[in-house]
Amino acid sequence: MRWPPWASESQARDKQDEQNQKNWDKSLNAIDWAAFTEPRTLIPTLILTTGIIGALQIHRRYLRRFPDAVSISPSYFRKRTILGQVTSVGDGDGFRLYHTPGGRLAGWGWLPWKRVPTAKKDLRDKTISVRLAGVDAPELAHFGRPEQPYAREAHEWLTSYVLNRRVRVLVHRQDQYQRVVASAYVRRAIDFPIPFRRRDVSYEMLTRGLATVYEAKAGSEFGGPELERKYREAESIAKRKGTGLWKGYRRNRKGWESPREYKTRMGLEEQSQGKGN
């Protein structure tokens, strides 16, 4: 039986519609790779990708905050400085620093979400313990040990000089007490004759006779031979003038005791007492 002519035409149209639908679906699912290589697409994509990668690198290199000494990358040692605010001064040659990467330019101090905490509970596990490089200050009373002469004066001076101030530290290394041994620098508005001159905190303590050059057999760190010479010269001048803890040094050398000698004597006494028990 032959189908009417119009039936064949209808079947042909259906097949054509079905083929057109398949072609349409295929075109929707196909990826036009050529479009990605067109300048109008390629250039904005490259700019956006480069911008994102650059922003991540800047954040990682300049704006990442270190909460404690252990978090500081060894790549910083002797190469890069860390800016922060001193939140407490524990003794005559050490303090705690709250890292503020980028400083005021990054919003620290004036943006509401970038303020240095003041409460102790908010500062817990969020500060870097800094040990001043190249110097040894007299020991305060602690762990049952008596206070050394000029220990309080050294602590009070350091507190007045750096507490709540912005300080920049050059980290030399970490020590066994989870601190960083670092050179610390501070700028003060009232500084005669040159305001905002950068001051080396360790050097300032030596010139005032509030510390001696660090003399331990191991673990001494100055930040280089040039700084060591500078520190020893400052100590020599203070010693000659009898400044600070050097007062009476010439008259009673045998009775005078350096911070290093004091710690050595205390350690020997404690060992002796331990053996006696």
From Swiss-Prot:
<keyword id="KW-0472">Membrane</keyword>
<feature type="compositionally biased region" description="Basic and acidic residues">
    <location>
        <begin position="11"/>
        <end position="22"/>
    </location>
</feature>
<keyword id="KW-0378">Hydrolase</keyword>
<dbReference type="GO" id="GO:0046872">
    <property type="term" value="F:metal ion binding"/>
</dbReference>
<feature type="active site">
    <location>
        <position position="179"/>
    </location>
</feature>
<dbReference type="InterPro" id="IPR016071">
    <property type="entry name" value="Staphylococal_nuclease_OB-fold"/>
</dbReference>
<keyword id="KW-1133">Transmembrane helix</keyword>
<protein>
    <recommendedName>
        <fullName>Probable endonuclease lcl3</fullName>
        <ecNumber>3.1.-.-</ecNumber>
    </recommendedName>
</protein>
<feature type="binding site">
    <location>
        <position position="136"/>
    </location>
    <ligand>
        <name>Ca(2+)</name>
    </ligand>
</feature>
<keyword id="KW-0106">Calcium</keyword>
<feature type="active site">
    <location>
        <position position="131"/>
    </location>
</feature>
<feature type="domain" description="TNase-like">
    <location>
        <begin position="80"/>
        <end position="248"/>
    </location>
</feature>
<feature type="region of interest" description="Disordered">
    <location>
        <begin position="1"/>
        <end position="22"/>
    </location>
</feature>
<keyword id="KW-0496">Mitochondrion</keyword>
<feature type="compositionally biased region" description="Basic and acidic residues">
    <location>
        <begin position="257"/>
        <end position="268"/>
    </location>
</feature>
<feature type="region of interest" description="Disordered">
    <location>
        <begin position="257"/>
        <end position="277"/>
    </location>
</feature>
<comment type="similarity">
    <text>Belongs to the LCL3 family.</text>
</comment>
<dbReference type="GO" id="GO:0005739">
    <property type="term" value="C:mitochondrion"/>
</dbReference>
<dbReference type="GO" id="GO:0016020">
    <property type="term" value="C:membrane"/>
</dbReference>
<keyword id="KW-0255">Endonuclease</keyword>
<dbReference type="Pfam" id="PF00565">
    <property type="entry name" value="SNase"/>
</dbReference>
<feature type="active site">
    <location>
        <position position="139"/>
    </location>
</feature>
<feature type="transmembrane region" description="Helical">
    <location>
        <begin position="42"/>
        <end position="58"/>
    </location>
</feature>
<keyword id="KW-0812">Transmembrane</keyword>
<dbReference type="InterPro" id="IPR035437">
    <property type="entry name" value="SNase_OB-fold_sf"/>
</dbReference>
<keyword id="KW-0540">Nuclease</keyword>
<dbReference type="GO" id="GO:0004519">
    <property type="term" value="F:endonuclease activity"/>
</dbReference>
<keyword id="KW-0479">Metal-binding</keyword>
